[in-house]
């Protein structure tokens, strides 16, 4: 399919969308939306509406970020008249809507004769009003940046297209809606867009909104390659899994993203962690990796090695089938078993046996496998599981001891209350 690339320069104040809504009955309207020029980031919706049947009595604007699943509706106060001009602001920064999110909006109008009219749905993509943005896009990918010339943007765009093609082949799926990457030049600019974010955060991904916001400075080719291949993996996988109620474990999501990076740095880390006994239990890799820098680094590397082993052992077709099974709402253990012939615990133990200082399979199952019923949080560990059992034993013992005391007390009370023989 031929893809049309559109290159556009966006001004500091964006006139992002607008159009005339043809009349349906007596009401007609023209709606626009723009990004205001001052921070915080705010969308400004405006409308001119007319009715030939009476006064416009009610106006309400509806808007939502595409992919959010939640539509916001806000009534607008105004003086009723046959022709009105309405406006409404929306603080996107306060509502944690990232730069690059695609916004859909329309207006609903009512006049005094009871006529109603919805304007056609329109879209705009607000970025950050502090910078002069450039965007290169087609139906699959949009790259927005301000630091660097057109050649730099073209390089990012081509790298992103290469990453998407690799992901589509690896997952056996096509991109169903455009994914967008927004590149800030440095940490200060990034922090200005996300003022409440921890200072150590260097990027944000919004898979449901199909947006990733990253720090990529002009000319940083190696970093740009790494970021695009990694971050686009999360966005594509989210599209693949749309409609499924089965969660993708963190080791599979992050492991696939790491696997897609052009250069792997994980093999040596994991061999060293295996030799020193610093590998993380499988339970740790199911959810959020936490905030401990050393553990997070091991978690990412371990996840990449797990995905690498899975692809090599189960094959490309089997790997794709795992995701297809999950799309059909098979949990990960069943999805692996159906596609590869083993559940997740057996898979993990098989991988573990390929590393130095490998424990016995039985030991690996005891220490590293999650409970069948639920995946522990990132903070969980086998030590905490063992301590929980010990606490349970103490609790049962205490109940038994208290029971003995209660029996003794009851026995004494009965003896004291027993009627004594009458005196003669």
PLM features per residue range, with description:
Residues 1-8:
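Bacterial N-terminal signal peptides that target proteins for export
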Residues 21-133, 139, 424:
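Glycan-association/targeting regions that enable binding to alpha-glucans and other polysaccharides
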Residues 199-211, 216, 222-227, 239-385:
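Acidic/His/Gly-enriched intrinsically disordered linker/tail segments
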Residues 125-127, 167, 171, 410, ...:
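Polytopic transmembrane helical bundles with strong interfacial aromatic enrichment
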Residues 398-424:
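C-terminal membrane-anchoring or membrane-association module
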Residues 8-18:
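Bacterial N-terminal signal peptides
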